[in-house]
Amino acid sequence: MRTIPCNPNAQPEVEEVLDYLAQIEGKGILTGQHTQTMEQPEIWRIREITGKLPAICGFELLSYSPNIRRETADEECLKEVDENCGTLEKAWEWVERGGLLTFTWHWFSPIGGRDKSFYAEKTDYDASRAVIDGTPENEALRHDLDHMADILQPFCDRHIPILWRPFHESEGEWFWWGAKGPEVAAELFRFMFRYYTQHHHLDNLIWVWNSPLPEGYVGDEYCDIISRDLYTEP
């Protein structure tokens, strides 16, 4: 496993995490659990059964999207958003416990859309135009990225490394960022990388690419870790 961060200006804590992951490669694993609500029932169920907490806790940022159109949202969407509100408080608590963070963002489309507009079927937002400077789609993309950067900045200020996994499951067409194909999704990822490392200097992020498709790979210079979402039947 490569231990040199793809961001040449990455904070030392980023390299420390990558070094540790390299040291345990082939020898052990880190357990993790994704959560989405303030109650985090999954985490406490794990502790109830094992007496321990996982090493990694995943946090969902969907409610932090700036373009949530509540007037178009159904009851299920509103419930999901409301239950997710404030979960970054739990992320800070996890930091105080010494755990590792990973963030996922079901990003409501930057303009337009209705209901759960992170789904492609709920928006006409064109990801292929979002990477073209000067387009309304690009301006909206930058606006949302600035908004999220403000949320991430306090973690950067305290040198808290984050496994940052944007545009997840980009191999599929179900999210707006994957609807125009894996190459467009990869370009979105590269755009975010450049914007966050060169403009916002979020040097605490560990960049995680999430797709099994080689044709959609962003390149080693933009990615620290390759991941994949797998679902099994209950």
What are these regions (language model features)?
Residues N7, E48, Y195-P234:
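Surface-exposed substrate-engagement region within the catalytic domains
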Residues Q11-E13, G181, P234:
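Alpha-helix capping and helix-coil boundary motifs
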Residues E16-V17, E39-I46, G86-E89, H147-I151, ...:
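Alpha-helical scaffolding within the catalytic cores
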Residues G28-Q33, P54-L61, L100-W105, I162-P166, ...:
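Structural recognition of the beta-strand scaffold that forms the well-ordered cores
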Residues Q36-M38, L62-S65, F108-I111, H168-G172, ...:
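Solvent-exposed loop/turn segments at secondary-structure junctions
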